[in-house]
Amino acid sequence: LVSIGFILLNLYFVVKKDSLIVNALPVLLGVFLLALFSFDKLIWFVAFFAPLSLPLSEIIPSFSFDMYLPTEPLLFGILILFLLKVIHERKFDRDILLHPVSMAIYINLIWIFLTSLTSTMPVVSFKFLLARMWFVVCLYLLTAKIFKSGKKMEQYVWLYLIAFIVVVFYATYRHWGYGLFNKQAAHYVVSPFYNDHTSYGAAVAIYLPFSVLFAFSKVYSWKFRRVALVVLGILVMAFVLSY
């Protein structure tokens, strides 16, 4: 019955509304179930899709607002679910909540809130505060809890790297068409995944040390280090071509 209902609803939206939006429902349901039973799996999902996210303006240019899909809606959803979970369970890791870094972040958030009240563009300011909050919850509070296991930190890095290498090949292929020594081309070949070569180069620089560690640390097997060495070579190439 559920399947028949989904098919009929999908047909209605395709025929009457010329829209495929109903096809997103199974994905949304899957994400909701992931969040319900395992926050860390949802964080892995965000880590993998972060480099591959596309701005909404690239898909629907007529929209008056912009966001990166699918990561920013996911981060917002994680924020809401996290707050509901904390309210329901009335607990979270106190070591993380009361850490000096956490305290500094709280002061920053309070300051943003106070300045948003007196802002000449309050809507923009509160949107910025909301975005800051979902980044803090997902990429600080939850990851700090998950990363208590070193192995999970490695998984997070590798998920990002695998997706990021796809972007590197895409950017390099486009750059090749303009000439690899064309510095001006480096500004736009990374679009639409990155705004310009600066943010792209910064992402490469952040993950280069991890690749060096994976490639040369004897903690890892020789097979693993060979794969990491290839990844390191790709990132070095990307760093050079990012100009």
Task: Indicate where each model-derived feature is located.
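Transmembrane signal-anchor hairpin modules in multi-pass inner-membrane enzymes, especially those
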Residues: L1-F113, V124, K148-W158, F214-V227
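Alpha-helical transmembrane segments of multi-pass inner-membrane proteins
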Residues: V2-N10, V27-F32, L79, I105-L117, ...
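Membrane-interface micro-motifs in multi-pass membrane enzymes
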Residues: D18-I21, S64-L74, F128-R132, F193-Y207
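Hydrophobic alpha-helical transmembrane segments of multi-pass membrane proteins
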Residues: F32, F126-L130, T143
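Transmembrane alpha-helical core residues of multi-pass small-molecule transporters
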Residues: F49-A50, A131, A163
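Juxtamembrane membrane-water interface segments that cap and precede transmembrane helices
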Residues: L54-F63, T118, F181-F193
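Alpha-helical transmembrane segments and their immediate interhelical/interface regions
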Residues: T120-V136
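Transmembrane alpha-helical segments of multipass membrane enzymes and assembly factors
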Residues: L142-K151, L241
